[in-house]
């Protein structure tokens, strides 16, 4: 297999979907911010553990919903927002919280409640697919009632067939994510004389010492370093423990030298905005938000020549959620092509909803050429999905990455 193409069959299908001018979905979130090895092992809980009982659903008598999500992942500046439209159409009020900064960090906050089937303070949330798989395998999430999600039929077929949830009974893709290089255009050119970073080595320029940030999401940051070293991160024969530790050594060295100043979750955007960071390993959609807040095209985003990472964040309903039907209605709303298009046009992530591209073009014809929402085959050839890890690998890899984060 061409190592530049995603190994995961879901992501390979995204390429075909792009060729057919269909819409694909987001990705990447990979994982870290300080959680203990014990927490990581708990995330890989055995499938034969005692089953949990879903909480009583009070949706019919209480038209409310709490949604925990990532920062910059909603069209909040729009008037009305899609959340406003959802309320007007359904009567359901959504308390929307941007408190999902990092997969492992969030898991660390809610793992005890999850394990007991208790309320985690959210009726619906959006972990990255690898974390969603852990929750599903551990029995932490509820099974959907598809009768409440008729628009599920609009899911891109590429997202069916996942081993952890083949028929999408417990998870639905929210957005697809790309990770690559975000950079302050003027500051980067002033410091280096170049227009934009192209390869990882560009981040190690002495002129950028102390002005580099990387994501605390292990699969993105380490994945990009691995790809720079010629490793196919979707292939178990290529992404070995030795290869991973070699990439960790590079990152650790740059942290020790002071080249990398920060390892952060979604809060990395603050460092770019205030000028502390000039270049960061970052998520594509965040750059649209940063530029919107800046009021001009201050930041750029590029995939490294060796490639960027791709993955997806997924809707899940925790076992302790008490507004399951309301959460299902929310998913159904965002799987309506027009609503998906409005959201994608703002957040600039890949949408998993069939028909959203056509609706987006009606909103703004220029969106048809936006590679961050509707990537072409050539663009997707520069992306790879991080392969699934077994429990032993997860523990070893996370422990090594955690050690580096503590030193940053």
Where are the language model's segments positioned?
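A structural signal for short loop-to-beta-strand junctions that line the ligand-binding cleft
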Residues: 118-127, 142-183, 211
């Amino acid at each position: 297999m061409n190592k530049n193409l995603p190994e995961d069959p879901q992501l390979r299908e995204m390429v075909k979907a792009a060729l057919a001018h269909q819409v694909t979905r987001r990705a990447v979130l990979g994982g870290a911010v300080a959680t203990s090895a014990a927490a990581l092992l708990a995330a890989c809980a055995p499938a034969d553990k005692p089953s949990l009982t879903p909480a009583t659903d009070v949706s019919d008598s209480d038209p409310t919903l709490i949604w925990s999500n990532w920062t910059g992942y909603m069209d909040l500046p729009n008037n009305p927002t899609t959340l406003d439209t959802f309320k007007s159409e359904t009567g359901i009020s959504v308390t929307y919280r941007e408190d999902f900064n990092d997969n492992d960090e969030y898991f660390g906050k809610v793992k005890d409640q999850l394990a007991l089937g208790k309320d985690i303070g959210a009726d619906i949330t959006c972990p990255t697919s690898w974390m969603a798989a852990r929750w599903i395998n551990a029995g932490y999430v509820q099974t959907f009632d598809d009768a409440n999600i008729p628009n599920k039929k609009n899911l891109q077929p590429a997202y069916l067939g996942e081993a952890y949830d083949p028929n999408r009974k417990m998870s639905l893709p929210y957005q697809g994510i790309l990770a690559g290089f975000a950079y302050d255009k003027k500051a980067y050119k002033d410091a280096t004389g170049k227009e934009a970073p192209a390869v990882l080595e560009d981040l190690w320029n002495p002129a950028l010492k102390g002005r580099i940030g990387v994501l605390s999401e292990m699969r993105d940051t380490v994945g990009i370093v691995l790809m720079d070293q010629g490793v196919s991160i979707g292939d178990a024969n290529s992404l070995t423990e030795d290869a991973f530790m070699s990439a960790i050594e590079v990152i650790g060295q740059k942290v020790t030298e002071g080249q990398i100043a920060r390892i952060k979750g979604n809060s990395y955007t603050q460092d770019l905005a205030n000028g502390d960071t000039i270049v960061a390993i970052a998520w594509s959609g965040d750059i649209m938000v940063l530029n919107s807040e800046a009021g001009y095209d201050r930041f750029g985003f590029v995939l490294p020549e060796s490639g960027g990472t791709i993955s997806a964040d997924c809707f899940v309903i925790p076992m302790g959620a008490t507004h399951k039907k309301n959460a299902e209605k929310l998913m159904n709303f965002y799987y309506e092509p027009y609503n998906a298009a409005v959201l994608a046009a703002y957040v600039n992530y890949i949408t998993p909803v069939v028909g959203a591209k056509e609706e987006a073009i009606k909103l703004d014809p220029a969106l048809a050429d936006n590679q961050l929402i509707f990537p072409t085959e050539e663009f997707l050839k520069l992306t790879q999905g991080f392969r699934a890890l077994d429990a032993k690998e997860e523990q070893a890899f996370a422990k090594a990455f955690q050690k580096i984060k503590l030193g940053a």
